[in-house]
């Protein structure tokens, strides 16, 4: 979920908001593996499915994508410089739930934990809000993800 996305629509208009969502979707797809699925779920929420991925690696991917979103300046080709942050929730099959409804519910709960505290972070089902990766964790996660 994108933090304060309504402000983008209110400030720049819904067309710019739609362009931002489209660019965001493209960036998410580009930064996932070929077997992964990244799609807009509704409003300013995206879902990313990571088949054959452990919860630990899913958390690594979530943190990496979180960093990508918060550090990117969006819509520069349109002459805009939009910065936005995400609130991210992670749930894993079969560790957290064995149903798609359960996974979405738990990922939503984790995301709302972030939204209701400090925003701009990642939380995982049954683990709470997660610290940012250190450089060593980044390197280990990159190696594991390949």
Where are these regions (language model features)?
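Conserved metal-coordinating catalytic motifs of nucleotidyl cyclase and c-di-GMP turnover enzymes
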Residues: 1, 43, 107
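Active-site loop/short helix in cyclic nucleotide turnover domains
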Residues: 2-16, 28, 32, 45, ...
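Residue-level recognition of strand-loop junctions within catalytic nucleotide-signaling folds
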Residues: 10, 50-53, 70, 93-94
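Heptad-repeat coiled-coil signal-transmission/dimerization helices
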Residues: 21, 25-28, 62-63, 104
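Short catalytic/binding micro-motifs of nucleotide second-messenger systems
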Residues: 30-35, 67-79, 111-113, 117
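A short pre-motif secondary-structure segment
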Residues: 37-40
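Catalytic-core segments of nucleotide cyclases and related cyclic-nucleotide turnover enzymes
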Residues: 55, 59, 63, 78, ...
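PAS and PAS-like sensory/regulatory domains
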Residues: 84-86
């Amino acid at each position: 979920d994108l933090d304060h996305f309504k402000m983008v629509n209110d400030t720049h208009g819904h067309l710019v908001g739609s362009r931002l969502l489209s660019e965001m979707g493209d960036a998410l797809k580009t930064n996932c593996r070929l077997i992964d699925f990244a799609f807009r779920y509704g409003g300013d929420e995206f879902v990313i499915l990571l088949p054959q991925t452990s919860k630990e690696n899913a958390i690594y991917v979530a943190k990496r994508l979180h960093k990508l979103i918060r550090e990117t300046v969006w819509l520069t080709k349109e002459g805009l410089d939009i910065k936005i942050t995400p609130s991210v929730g992670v749930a894993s099959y079969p560790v957290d739930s064995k149903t798609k409804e359960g996974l979405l519910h738990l990922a939503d709960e984790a995301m709302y934990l972030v939204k209701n505290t400090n925003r701009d972070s990642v939380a995982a089902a049954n683990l709470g809000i997660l610290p940012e990766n250190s450089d060593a964790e980044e390197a280990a996660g990159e190696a594991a993800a390949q």
